[in-house]
Amino acid sequence: TIAVALAEGSQRGAVCEHRQISNTPAALTRLATKLSQTGSVLRFCYEAGPCGYGIQRQLTAAGHDCAVVAPSLIPRKPGDRIKTDRRDAINLAKLHRAGALTAVWVPDPAHEAVRDLVRARLAAVRSLRQARQQLSGFLLRHGHHYSRPAWTLMHRRWLAGLRFEQPAHHIVLEDCIATIEAATARRDRLTAQIETMLENWALAPVVHALQSLRGMALVSAATVIAELGDITRFANPRQLMAYLGLVPSEHSSGGTRRQGGITKAGN
């Protein structure tokens, strides 16, 4: 469900809880239609979350302004330990009316699709790494050590020639090898799909330009652009670095300036 709160346009206007509605397109349409009957200009906002941008796109297509708010940047009162959907909705309505909320950049469906594809490949890489670590740990526990570079053709031949006294251990070895082969095939398949999708992507020229940097191959460049989106939304490099979390943290007061490690604000 969605908790809905309303704030009147003036700063001293009333703020009240409207209702709880189902999280469905039909319920959202009925809500927007009913609120539009007063003739007022409607401005919606909601926290970014697992439901994505469907609500924003539906309301925008209907002609309404809708902002997706970054949860980590919502101002909160110190000591406020009570969190409910109703309180969150009322707080968002007040802050949105005051202009105190920070909206996230909303990608178009094509950009979101490329980003999902890139993230799927990253998940495949993590799965492959985990499978390799599991096999390495298994072999280490049973006294098998390979002194040369791992995961090469020679290393695979060495794995295929291993023998164990216990048949169950050999079953585990074969299962680990099969898992690694499946994860490798998944990673390579998604990599090829990324290369294919880039041919028709609007930001493909930016990806190719980024590859002029040393050490930046196609997949890395596509990942950066897919996550950043439209770079022109940043007024200067300082804003971009702050978004990425590559600027130092700071706790300064008066004439004293203290800087710490980077903020790591990005993903």
Which residues fall in each region the model found?
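A detector of single, family-specific signature residues
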Residues: 1-267
